[in-house]
């Protein structure tokens, strides 16, 4: 006969009916495999093979099938980023604040000063993949909004800009490691077969903005394009000197400054490659000869002398960039139609520079004009669609040959979090502005974390239906106007109102590397967790009567009274600001005595899920269909939501095991009315997870496959099972008997599975019942040799071992108050390497 809901409740001993026998008789029956199989059949829990079509949507859950296309907002505002500069002497500042730091605090702070990321393999992608075509109908708008976002990050000192293969520029305050690369000298050496070419810079390794002006760059760009000697004063050179350079420089010398579109600019076919390279080498040598006044003997025996460039030789950059700039080629061209881009280019005389350079230049490892990840924009969050957020896709480091094993770190579980934060303190939470962008990244990691764009001309070439990209001639005057279209003209005119002359700047190609840790790499959450936990550890030791705790960028402060909390807030805020940590005071939230943290509400009574999660669960059950197979990917989403609140239900995670089984088998799951009603009843009444209290354990349980024994104070009990049971099942039953007979919330056991409180591997009915009975129970490990219940479980009641007085101390897991972390194992698998390739030649194991 079909199993009724009431019968199911009685099987789980959830009813107060009088038909059920003693617990010691009823509970072992729930471990019976045959009973579990029959219940699964009656509830339709095991019927995974269905022939009718699957349901792919339940309420808002669509699994991996996203039915809503991403929405582009032309009115997106680019968020502003403060000038974030974490103080380099952060350890000294912390020691001034709280005294000597612990070993763990120092180790964590050294880990992020600077952060390092050196994967063994990196895959380089063409610049065309820099900005992802996430919005096919809004390619131009998305391109410029993304470029503006990247420009904002660069101006805020969060990105490096690749200037040459071995140099980069940035804005903001430099760190010491950005000046002392390669022993503080800017030295470029090529291999012997490519000749010997050496340049020297200022000893600090920083080239100031004024020493490398646009005049040099524009002339270098001219030389790369192979212009005639009369087109630039630096391009002319004496034949004899040219010959000597030609003998020493390989014809395939890399281009020098910036990144230009492939094949851009009109190249005179009469100028061959070797003569172009010859002039390029001469110009490069002449240009670099004005960067410093020091002398150095090169390895080939030639002394190279450097002088300062007179300002009178500077020319406007726009003159030198006409031939390489796609934008400025429209300036003097004849309009092809009323929608020709030349109308837009000639709107104003001041078209702005082709390029911008940072306040500082540094030496970097060889960095190609490529990207290692793509970027695109999305809404900042579901509640803020007015601002955009940059999504960086460095997923290559999570798959394939370029996969990196990220370091693991502790996340507080629910019980540890409750033990730590469930108190009668008054709480507030701090908002750290752009938390990831606080942690500096070593410049040697730049070649692995590259983003950028190939320039507007390549995007226009994709849009244009009649564009011709043949023989690398795109950008020449012959097909310059092929990109003109009404759609592009209208888009650019609208964008012109927003960006003005920056349209010209943003239309150029660019390669950027991260100067602060990006959000799209698995190393970043680990580093952020180490950083904030170390800072909170320092704060806790400075104010031992208060509590500071963090998870990622979520920092909470607790004090015994509101006035005390406000004093603490002022002191901690001033301390964090002195370290260079930026807080957003407008987003500081005062919670009172019930803290909202990590999706939970935590008070002196314990922990419950936040209300918005409870409402989601109710909505899910309202939309949940019965007798219809639901796609296992949708089941994943349902289990994700229900699993978050499972610890607050009577039966816990074991109640969801049928769903887990269907997901593991990648089969559809059909909710029967009885199973849905059972789950719904579970989740409509949520019970708080209470804080564990310290105490002395005086109740012990033990079992053998054939019997069980209890020691409750000086009383001893024993019993036998009808049939032999697996040892873990027997131990779990003994613990349940101890809880039900004594009512104690502290039980001693020698079984590790019972200690773990994970009952999902037991027979389904027993797991649900055991979770119900043992909810809120704490366990203490007692060795078998010392367990007072060991003898009764073996049928020996006459022998009485002395009663142990086992103290129990609630654990806060690895999220302890003083940032204690386990020692590093002696051998680690291949993962991120923390030795800089600039100083150490790493060899694979």
UniProtKB/Swiss-Prot annotation:
Terminal protein domain (TP) is hepadnavirus-specific. Spacer domain is highly variable and separates the TP and RT domains. Polymerase/reverse-transcriptase domain (RT) and ribonuclease H domain (RH) are similar to retrovirus reverse transcriptase/RNase H. The polymerase/reverse transcriptase (RT) and ribonuclease H (RH) domains are structured in five subdomains: finger, palm, thumb, connection and RNase H. Within the palm subdomain, the 'primer grip' region is thought to be involved in the positioning of the primer terminus for accommodating the incoming nucleotide. The RH domain stabilizes the association of RT with primer-template. Hepadnaviral virions contain probably just one P protein molecule per particle. Residues 1-179 are annotated as: Terminal protein domain (TP). Residues 349-692 are annotated as: Polymerase/reverse transcriptase domain (RT). PROSITE patterns: RT_POL. It comes from Hepatitis B virus genotype A2 subtype adw2 (isolate Germany/991/1990). The record marks 65 as: Priming of reverse-transcription by covalently linking the first nucleotide of the (-)DNA. Activated by host HSP70 and HSP40 in vitro to be able to bind the epsilon loop of the pgRNA. Because deletion of the RNase H region renders the protein partly chaperone-independent, the chaperones may be needed indirectly to relieve occlusion of the RNA-binding site by this domain. Inhibited by several reverse-transcriptase inhibitors: Lamivudine, Adefovir and Entecavir. GO terms for molecular function: DNA binding; DNA-directed DNA polymerase activity; metal ion binding; RNA-directed DNA polymerase activity; RNA-DNA hybrid ribonuclease activity. Mg(2+) binds at residues 431, 553-554. The keyword Transferase applies. It holds the Pfam family DNA_pol_viral_C. Keywords: DNA replication, DNA-binding, DNA-directed DNA polymerase, Endonuclease, Host-virus interaction, Hydrolase, Inhibition of host innate immune response by virus, Inhibition of host RLR pathway by virus, Magnesium, Metal-binding, Multifunctional enzyme, Nuclease, Nucleotidyltransferase, RNA-directed DNA polymerase, Transferase, Viral immunoevasion. It comes from the Viruses. One of its GO terms (biological process) is DNA replication. It catalyses: DNA(n) + a 2'-deoxyribonucleoside 5'-triphosphate = DNA(n+1) + diphosphate; Endonucleolytic cleavage to 5'-phosphomonoester. This is Protein P. Its EC number is 2.7.7.7, 2.7.7.49, 3.1.26.4. InterPro entries: DNA/RNA_pol_sf, DNApol_viral_C, DNApol_viral_N, HBV_DPOL, Rev_trsase/Diguanyl_cyclase, RT_dom, Viral_Replic_Matur_Polypro. The gene is P. Belongs to the hepadnaviridae P protein family.
């Amino acid at each position: 006969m079909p199993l009724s809901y009431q019968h199911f409740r009685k099987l789980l001993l959830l009813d107060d009916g009088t038909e059920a026998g003693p617990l010691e008789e009823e509970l072992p029956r729930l471990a019976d495999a045959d009973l579990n199989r029959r219940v699964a059949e009656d509830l339709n829990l095991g019927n995974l093979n269905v022939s009718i079509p699957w349901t792919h949507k339940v309420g808002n859950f669509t699994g991996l099938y996203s039915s809503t296309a991403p929405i582009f907002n032309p009115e997106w505002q680019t968020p502003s980023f403060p000038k974030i500069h974490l103080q380099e002497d952060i350890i000294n500042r912390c020691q001034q604040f709280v005294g000597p730091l612990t070993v763990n605090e120092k180790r964590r702070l050294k880990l992020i000063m600077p952060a390092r990321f050196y994967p063994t393999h990196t895959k380089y992608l063409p610049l065309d993949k820099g900005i992802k075509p996430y919005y096919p109908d809004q390619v131009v708008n998305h391109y410029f909004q993304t470029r503006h976002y990247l420009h904002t990050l660069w101006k805020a000192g969060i990105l490096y800009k690749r200037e040459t293969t071995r140099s980069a520029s940035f804005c903001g305050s430099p760190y010491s490691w950005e000046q002392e690369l390669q022993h503080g000298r800017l030295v470029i050496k090529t291999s012997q077969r490519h000749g010997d070419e050496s340049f020297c810079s200022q000893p600090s390794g920083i080239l100031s903005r004024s020493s490398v002006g646009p005049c040099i760059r524009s002339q270098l760009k001219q030389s790369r394009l192979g212009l005639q000697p009369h087109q630039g004063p630096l391009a002319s050179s004496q034949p004899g000197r040219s010959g000597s350079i030609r003998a020493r420089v390989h014809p395939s010398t890399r281009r020098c400054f910036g990144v230009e579109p492939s094949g851009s600019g009109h190249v005179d076919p009469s100028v061959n490659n070797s003569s172009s390279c010859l002039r390029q080498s001469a110009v490069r040598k002449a240009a670099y000869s004005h960067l410093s006044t020091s002398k150095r003997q090169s390895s080939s025996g030639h002394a190279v002398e450097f002088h300062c460039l007179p300002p009178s030789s500077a020319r406007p950059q726009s003159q030198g960039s006409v031939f390489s700039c796609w934008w400025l080629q429209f300036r003097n061209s004849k309009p092809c139609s009323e929608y020709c881009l030349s109308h837009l280019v000639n709107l104003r005389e001041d078209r702005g520079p082709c390029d911008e350079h940072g306040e500082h230049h540094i030496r970097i490892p060889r960095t190609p004009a490529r990207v290692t990840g793509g970027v695109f924009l999305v809404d900042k969050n579901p509640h803020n669609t007015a601002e955009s957020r940059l999504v960086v896709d460095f997923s290559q480091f999570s798959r394939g040959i370029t996969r990196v094993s990220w370091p693991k770190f502790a996340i507080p579980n629910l019980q540890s979090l409750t033990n730590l934060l469930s108190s009668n303190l008054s709480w507030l939470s701090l908002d750290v502005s752009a938390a990831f962008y606080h942690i500096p990244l070593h410049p040697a990691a730049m070649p692995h974390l590259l983003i950028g764009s190939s320039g507007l001309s390549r995007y226009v070439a994709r849009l244009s239906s009649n564009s011709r990209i043949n023989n690398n001639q795109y950008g020449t005057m012959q097909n310059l106007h092929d990109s003109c279209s009404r759609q592009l003209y209208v888009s650019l005119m609208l964008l012109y109102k927003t960006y003005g002359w920056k349209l010209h700047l943003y239309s150029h190609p660019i390669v950027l590397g991260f100067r602060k840790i990006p959000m799209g790499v698995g190393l970043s959450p680990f580093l952020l967790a180490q950083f904030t936990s170390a800072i909170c550890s320092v704060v806790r030791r400075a104010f031992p009567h208060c509590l500071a705790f963090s998870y990622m960028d979520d920092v909470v402060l607790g004090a015994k009274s509101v006035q005390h909390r406000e004093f603490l807030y002022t002191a901690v805020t001033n301390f964090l600001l002195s370290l260079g940590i930026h807080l957003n005071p407008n987003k500081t939230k005062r919670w009172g005595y019930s803290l909202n943290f990590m999706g939970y509400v935590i008070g002196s009574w314990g922990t419950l899920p936040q209300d918005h999660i409870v409402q989601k669960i109710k909505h899910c059950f309202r939309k949940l269909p019965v007798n219809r197979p639901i796609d296992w990917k949708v089941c994943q989403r349902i289990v994700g939501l229900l699993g978050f609140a499972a610890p607050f239900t009577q039966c816990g995670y074991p109640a969801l095991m049928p769903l887990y089984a269907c997901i593991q088998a990648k089969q559809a799951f059909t909710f029967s009315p009885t199973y849905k009603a059972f789950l719904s009843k579970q989740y409509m009444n949520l019970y708080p997870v209470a804080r564990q209290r310290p105490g002395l354990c005086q109740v012990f349980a033990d079992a053998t496959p054939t019997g069980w024994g209890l020691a409750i104070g000086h009383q001893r009990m024993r019993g036998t099972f009808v049939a032999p049971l697996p040892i873990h099942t027997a131990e779990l039953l003994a613990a349940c008997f101890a809880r039900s007979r004594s009512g104690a919330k502290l039980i001693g056991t020698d079984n590790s599975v019972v200690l773990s409180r994970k009952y999902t591997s037991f027979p389904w009915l027993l797991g649900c019942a055991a979770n119900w009975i043992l909810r809120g129970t704490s366990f203490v490990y007692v060795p078998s040799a010392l367990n007072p219940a060991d003898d009764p479980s073996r049928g020996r009641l006459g022998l009485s071992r002395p009663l142990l007085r086992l103290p129990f101390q609630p654990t806060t897991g690895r999220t302890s108050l003083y940032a204690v972390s386990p020692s590093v194992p002696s051998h680690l698998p291949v993962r991120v390497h923390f030795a800089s390739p600039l100083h150490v030649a790493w060899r694979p194991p």
